[in-house]
Amino acid sequence: MQNPVFTSTPVTAASQDTSYNYGLAATDPSGGTVTFSLISAPAGATLTGNTINWAPTAAESRISNSFTAKATSSSGGSATQSWTVTPTGTVTVNWVNTDWTPSGAVQIPGPPIFVPSALVPQPDGSLELLSGTAASPGVYNIGQVPGGYYWLIQGTGPGSPLPPTGFWTNSSTFDLGRDSVGAQTGLLSAPEDTTFDFNLSGLDPSSTPGIVAFITDNPPFAPISFTPQPGVTTLSASAIVSSMFDWANVNTAFLVQYEPVSLSSLNNLVLGPELTLSNLALTSGTTNTISGTLAPSPQASVDLSIPGSKWASLFQNVAPGTVTPTGSWLSIAPEPYVIGVNAKPQLFAPPFGSHVYMVQPDSPSGLTYPGSACPSQPFFLPVAVDPPILADQNFGTLQYGDPFPSDWMRVLAFCQSVTTPFQVGSLTFPIALNYGMTVSPSSPSLAPLAGPVVDPTIDGSNLFTTTSVNSTVAKLNWSAPAGTSPYGYTVYVYQVIPRPSGFELLVAGNYSTAQTSMTLPPLTAGNTYLFVIITEVDGIANMQASPYRSQLPTGFATVMSAQVTISAGTAGPQLRGDPKELKRFLHPEGKRYRITAGHE
């Protein structure tokens, strides 16, 4: 008796929902007949005669599926053949935002023309961009994605040169949605001047003038602020606002009075009297009268103890040069209507707008701070900041008004900023970097949650040393920081463009990963780049599946590289795909930060 010998080669290529067929063949050296059986296989695979039939499902695609077939000869001999098949599959991207409004959570599908894509590394070193299609409102499919990791590229408009925002993932489902405050804001065809006449009473007759503000629940609308006279309880004033935002979209607004309170080096504005205006019917391009009586706010308090020494230790080994701490920020704010999650800014919303703070730094401008607290993006600094806190300090108890519904999310934000010198030619410029966190005011431990990455390198060279690399496909490596485990890291890539009196930083791409290394999509030979690596901590965010869904606590920390030049003449890998979409990688036109000698 001799064992049969397989003469067929397994078929290893397959695709989701497509028929897979493999015809088994074997010979019996003894001259007998051979029959076949299927010992192990994915669910749904069948053997008819000598042919294996299978239609990979979504759950079976993009993962390895094991097969074992057995050949048995008529004389009793047997042999087995084993192989694996990883079918290409469909990646499903859900882009449905949750907008929290006075009437509840509203599901808003992402822009239908902003179709995501997948940039897939190939075995030969090339990269292929696979375009997605819209399956239904807020749902997109990217077909024929092989198993393993790929870059999920967030969509923009067709042919847009905006730089890529990418996530390194192996997931077959991906959620690009986010939670945000307020209904969507409509746009007018052209800017219009809208007048507001305010007739208010119920102010706290403070001897130290604070700020009275009209703040909407739609973040893109900037607050309207006034400084009342000392000792008065009423305010009559007018304001003209020129804007393309349609005021008819504003349902709710808050009339608030902020009053200055200092705790040692923390100079705060805290919420005093307040009035919520609901079911507004505002009209753009005309005069709107706003009248009402503010009422005293119920009091809340927070004990502030800040371990400044732990923050100071963050600022070591984060940039090529020595950093200089420049300021700190502390705020407490509700997230209107938001329950159980943490809101993110609306997609494509401007960086400045309305935010209803209950505590914020005192503003020397006499205006409320028109922006989000503690931006993690590089180079943004809060407009109004307190001195940096570098030693452990107990500031005592801070009282503030909190008149808002108890089920709304409340967020305490604390961050510190530093600057580091950046040299272009013979000129040196300060570059700002931020470090921050958000927690619940009910348990405000203000020790930093996120630490900067450790020992970052590019192609094996120290990232803090000016260098040239001989590859357009740069590989970044770093070690994870101590402390709370991050859910991932984001690398901001900037092209450095010298100008006669300064330089520009052109955003060339934003790439995120849950790992401690990253092979970037191709850069351009001859260009000089700057890399900023952000460590990110979040209660629920998942960098490989749902990076924008958030829950407290959150934290971030920053590292900035030296200048890295891609050697001129360096050949890059082949890029395949729609030329219009590849433009985002080859010739990106992102936001430009222009820094000149007159604006240090």
Q: Where would I find each of the regions flagged by the language model?
A:
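Surface-exposed or secretory-pathway low-complexity segments enriched in glycine-proline
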Residues: 6-53, 81-87
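Extracellular acidic, Ser/Thr/Pro-rich low-complexity tracts
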Residues: 25-30, 73, 480-485
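Extracellular/luminal low-complexity segments enriched in Ser/Thr/Pro
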Residues: 51-62
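Conserved aromatic anchor
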Residues: 54, 468-485
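Preference for solvent-exposed, low-hydrophobicity sequence contexts
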Residues: 92-403, 422-426, 431-437
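Beta-strand-rich modules
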Residues: 523-542
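Extracellular fibronectin type III
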Residues: 539-573
